[in-house]
Design a protein with these regions (language model features):
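Extreme N-terminal leader/targeting segments of oxidoreductases
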Residues: 1-40
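N-terminal Rossmann-like FAD-binding beta1-loop-alpha1 element of flavoenzymes
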Residues: 36-65
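Glycine-rich FAD pyrophosphate-binding loop
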Residues: 58-78
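Dinucleotide-binding Rossmann-like beta1-alpha1 core, especially the glycine-rich loop
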Residues: 87-169
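Short beta-strand to alpha-helix junction loop
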Residues: 107-111, 139-146, 185-204, 213, ...
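Active-site substrate-recognition segment that forms the wall
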Residues: 115, 123-131, 218, 235-276, ...
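Helical element adjacent to the flavin cofactor pocket in flavoenzyme catalytic cores
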Residues: 153, 178-240
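C-terminal catalytic lobe of FAD-dependent flavoproteins
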Residues: 317-319, 324-434
Length: 436
């Protein structure tokens, strides 16, 4: 099987992203070289795994985190940095499928997720450039009217008072572009530097006694009353409980999860610091943006006045050679005034989606669990997911069961057939975007 941990990035190195230029990369933490026993073992030192470790420590549990590469190496340290509201489905769709009572649970958990992000930042004094405000930007009038309906529903039915509708004139004035027809501003959402955030969580976890091993790849798991994990170096871990939190990089450590979660790649560029007079209103407001395309554009400005712009996906294992130019073309459609701006950074990352885009919480066995598949909505949801896992282990909450009972169906066909099927499906939606 192709190893997604190594196919697109040099082994043991962070990608050369804008985010890595903003932090001081620490020395590699020790890899596991001896056999150990632990209460709880967590595979993956990303947002989910570190949130789980910190939440477990809060409840008096000890955990060990095994990271195949570097702390925050995957999507956790590469994403667009948006701390969004709600789930991947809007509330109307959740109500249609599950009824209002369950839709309310989804909403309350998502609201708690944002609060948990803010709480971790404040509690651990993580300097990650957090700022409030995310704009849902719509590419046509139909999407704009739909966004207004969503805003009304959230305000009236869920008492969410943080939304401000934007017409074409209003959104154009804020974003310094005529590309979008309207949308809304969500002041209850926000954005941050994800690598600073995840590294801050890692530092906090180590401070409270969590043992984190980097460059420690698990190659085999024997599930049972106790879990036996074997690493590529031959070290063995025996744990009472196990959490698989590798998301798009999990591979076949649990084939049932792998059949329900599809790794896909997404790409981001960052310009040179913008010249005086460019995007002045956008700089002043300092909001993040996600638009209404099926494969959305998402962007925001950095503290040093670069435009960080995400655009484009691919559905094969390897990043395409031209992804920088693909993302740049998408940026120029939104901001033609930046056609002569240099692109200083470009990077890709692998996230994980499910068929219905709801997160995949699974009971692998009586003592092993997996959480993955945030489908591009994971900065806040991964943090609450880790907390939910910790509460479940401590028998303080049934919310893990709430998510584990969601209908997350396997992708059709064996793994070798899923990629071409996914490509065909995504190409159809991409073509649909072009004619909207």
């Amino acid at each position: 099987m192709i190893d997604l941990l190594r196919i697109n990035d040099p082994e043991g190195e962070y990608p050369k992203s804008y985010y890595t230029s903003t932090v001081s990369i620490q020395n590699v933490l020790p890899s596991l070289q001896e056999n150990i026993k632990c209460q709880i073992c967590i595979i993956g030192a990303g947002l989910t795994g570190l949130s789980a470790a910190l939440s477990l420590a809060d409840l008096g549990y000890e955990s060990v985190v095994l990271e195949a590469n570097r702390l925050g190496f995957g999507a956790s340290g590469r994403n667009g940095g948006q701390v969004g509201s709600g789930q991947r489905w809007d509330q109307e769709k959740l109500e249609m499928h599950f009824g209002f009572k369950q839709a309310q649970i989804f909403w309350n958990i998502a609201e708690e997720a944002k609060k948990e992000v803010y709480s971790r930042i404040k509690r651990h004094e993580i300097k990650c450039d957090y700022n409030p405000g995310v704009i849902q930007a719509c590419i046509n009038r139909r999407d704009t009217l739909d966004s207004y309906d969503q805003a009304d529903q959230l305000t009236e039915k869920y008492n969410y008072q943080n939304l401000r509708k934007l017409n074409h004139e209003g959104i154009s004035e804020i974003l310094d572009t005529d590309f979008y027809k309207g949308g809304y501003l969500d002041l209850g959402a926000g954005h941050l530097n994800p690598l600073k955030f995840v590294l801050g969580l890692g530092s906090a976890a180590r401070t409270v006694g969590v043992k984190i091993y980097e460059k420690t790849k698990v190659t085999k798991i024997e599930y049972g009353k106790k879990n036996k994990l074997t690493t590529s170096a031959g070290a063995v871990v025996n744990s009472d409980y196990l959490l698989l939190a590798g998301n798009g990089y999990l591979g076949n450590l649990d084939k049932q999860t792998a059949s329900r979660v599809m790794p896909i790649n997404n790409f981001i560029i960052a310009t040179e610091p913008l010249k005086y007079g460019f995007l002045e209103s956008f700089l002043q407001h300092n909001y993040a943006v996600a638009d209404s395309k099926f494969v959305p554009n998402y962007f925001r400005l950095s503290p040093d006045k670069r435009l960080i712009f995400g655009g484009g996906e691919n559905y094969t294992y390897k990043f395409p050679k031209n992804f920088k130019e693909t993302a740049r073309k998408k940026m120029i459609k939104v901001y033609p005034q930046l056609k002569d701006s240099n692109i200083d950074f470009s990077w890709g990352g692998t996230l994980a989606i499910t068929r219905n885009r709801l997160p995949c919480f699974r009971k692998v066995s009586d003592t092993a669990y997996s959480i993955s598949g945030y489908s591009g909505h994971g900065v806040a949801l991964s943090i609450i997911a880790g907390k939910i896992f910790a509460e479940f282990i401590a028998k303080k909450s049934e919310r893990f069961d709430f998510f584990s009972q969601l209908p997350i169906e396997p992708f059709p066909g064996k793994s070798s057939f899923r990629w071409p099927l996914m490509v065909l499906g995504m190409l159809w939606y991409s073509l649909r975007d072009r004619f909207r």
